[in-house]
Design a protein with these regions (language model features):
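Von Willebrand factor type A / integrin I
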Residues: 1-24, 28, 46-48, 71, ...
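An amphipathic, basic-hydrophobic helix/alpha-beta surface used to engage anionic
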Residues: 12-270
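Active-site-proximal flexible loops/turns
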Residues: 60, 232, 281-284, 332
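Glycine-rich, flexible loop segments associated with nucleotide phosphate handling
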Residues: 84-92, 278-288
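Generic recognition of short, well-ordered alpha-helical interface segments
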Residues: 179, 239-242, 281-291
C-alpha cells in the first residue's frame, strides 16, 4: 500500500513538474508604470508592477525584479528592497498565479532632485515545481518620471516681481469693454461668470472661459536663459529653474496669462513637452511649464541673443520677465530692443544676485 502511495506521489510530482515548466514564460506579461508622470521633489508616488498569466496553466513560481535609480527612495519599510553595489535599489516580489489571472504590487517611492528618471527594464522570471529550472525575460516598455524643480528658496526677488506685475496689471484699466474673442482656455476660478462658455464646457473638457484679445488684460512672457559662462553654472541654473517655477505660480495665483520658454535642451520628450509653452492659465498649463522645467538640462538650445530675438515683436501690453544665471546680457543690443518693444516692461532677474 505504501509503495502505491509513493508511486502516486512521484507521478503527481512529475505531472506538476511538467505542467509548471519554464516554457510557460511565453504566456507571461509584465509591466511597471508610475501612477504620476510629473511629481514634485520628495512627493510620494507609486510604481505599479503587474504580472499576468495569459495561459491555461498554473504558474507555481514567478518573480518580479525592479532596479531603481539611486535617486529613488522607497517609502515603505515593509517592501522587500535592498541596495546593490551600483547604488541602485533592487526590489523583488515572488508569487504564484492561476490561469488567466494577474497580480499587482504597489511600491511607494519619492525622488528629491529635479530631472527625468527612466525606469530600467522590468525583469520577470518563472520556475518549475521542483525549483530545478528558471527562465527570465525583460519587459522593454519605456517608462519615465519627470521631477519638477523646487520653489525658490531665496525669494528676495518677490518685492521686485510684485512691483513689476503691478505695473503690468495697471494696463487692464486702459479700456473698459474689450470684446475681441480669440478662443477658450481652462477656467481658473478667478474669471467672472459671464466669461464662462457653457457650450464649450458641456463638451466634457471642464469649465472653459472665453479668451479676449485686448490691452486691458495683462499678459507676460517668462523667459529662462541657460546660455551663460558663469563659473557655478549648474547651481545657478537650478536656481533659475526654481525662480521660474515660483514666478509662474505667482502669475497663476494672480490670474495673469503668460507664455513660457526656456533656452535649454530637454533631457527627454517622455512627458510630451517642448521648451516652449503657449499662453494660458490653469492646472494643465502650469503642469506643462513644470514638465518643461523638469526636463531642462544645462545645455543651451541657442545663444542668448538668438533666444531673445524670437520675441522681438511689438509687445503691446505684454511684459517680459527674463531669468538668467548671471550678467549674461551686459552688452546685448537684442535685450535693449526687447526692452523698447515691451514699452519698458522688462524685468531681468539674475540668479547670482539676491535682488
Amino acid at each position: 500500500m505504501s509503495l502505491l502511495v509513493a508511486v502516486a506521489a512521484v507521478l503527481l510530482v512529475l505531472w506538476m513538474q511538467r505542467r509548471s515548466g519554464v516554457d510557460r514564460l511565453a504566456d507571461m506579461r509584465a509591466d511597471h508604470t508610475p501612477d504620476a508622470k510629473l511629481v514634485d521633489p520628495d512627493e510620494t508616488f507609486h510604481l505599479d508592477m503587474t504580472l499576468q498569466n495569459m495561459g491555461r496553466h498554473y504558474i507555481l513560481f514567478a518573480q518580479l525584479e525592479e532596479r531603481l535609480h539611486q535617486a529613488f527612495t522607497v517609502r515603505d519599510p515593509d517592501i522587500p528592497a535592498w541596495e546593490v553595489r551600483s547604488g541602485e535599489t533592487k526590489i523583488s516580489f515572488s508569487t504564484w498565479l492561476p490561469p488567466r489571472r494577474q497580480v499587482r504590487f504597489r511600491v511607494p517611492v519619492s525622488i528629491s532632485a529635479r530631472g527625468v528618471y527612466c525606469l530600467a527594464p522590468l525583469k520577470f522570471s518563472i520556475g518549475d515545481f521542483l525549483g530545478l529550472q528558471e527562465r527570465s525575460r525583460l519587459s522593454g516598455k519605456f517608462r519615465a518620471v519627470v521631477v519638477a524643480p523646487k520653489e525658490a528658496e531665496d525669494q528676495g526677488f518677490a518685492d521686485v516681481l510684485g512691483g513689476f506685475l503691478g505695473n503690468v496689471s495697471v494696463r487692464r484699466f486702459i479700456h473698459e469693454d474689450p470684446a475681441l474673442f480669440t478662443g477658450f482656455r481652462e477656467y481658473t476660478g478667478r474669471e467672472p461668470m459671464k466669461q464662462i462658455s457653457w457650450y464649450q464646457s458641456a463638451k466634457g473638457r471642464g469649465l472653459m472661459v472665453k479668451i479676449l484679445d485686448h490691452t486691458a488684460e495683462p499678459q507676460v512672457s517668462v523667459l529662462v536663459n541657460a546660455d551663460t559662462r558663469a563659473k557655478d553654472r549648474g547651481p545657478l541654473l537650478e536656481k533659475c529653474y526654481s525662480m521660474a517655477r515660483t514666478i509662474c505660480r505667482v502669475l497663476e495665483e494672480r490670474g495673469i496669462a503668460y507664455d513660457f520658454a526656456v533656452n535649454a535642451e530637454l533631457a527627454s520628450s517622455a512627458a510630451g513637452t517642448d521648451n516652449t509653452v503657449g499662453e494660458g492659465l490653469g492646472a494643465n498649463h502650469f503642469a506643462a511649464v513644470l514638465g518643461c522645467l523638469g526636463q531642462a538640462t544645462y545645455v543651451r538650445a541657442a545663444s542668448g541673443d538668438e533666444f531673445l530675438a524670437e520675441f522681438l515683436v511689438p509687445a503691446g501690453a505684454r511684459g517680459h520677465i527674463l531669468i538668467t544665471p548671471s550678467d549674461d546680457f551686459a552688452a546685448s543690443r537684442v535685450l535693449e530692443l526687447l526692452r523698447e518693444l515691451s514699452g519698458g516692461t522688462l524685468l531681468v532677474l539674475q540668479a547670482d544676485r539676491s535682488v
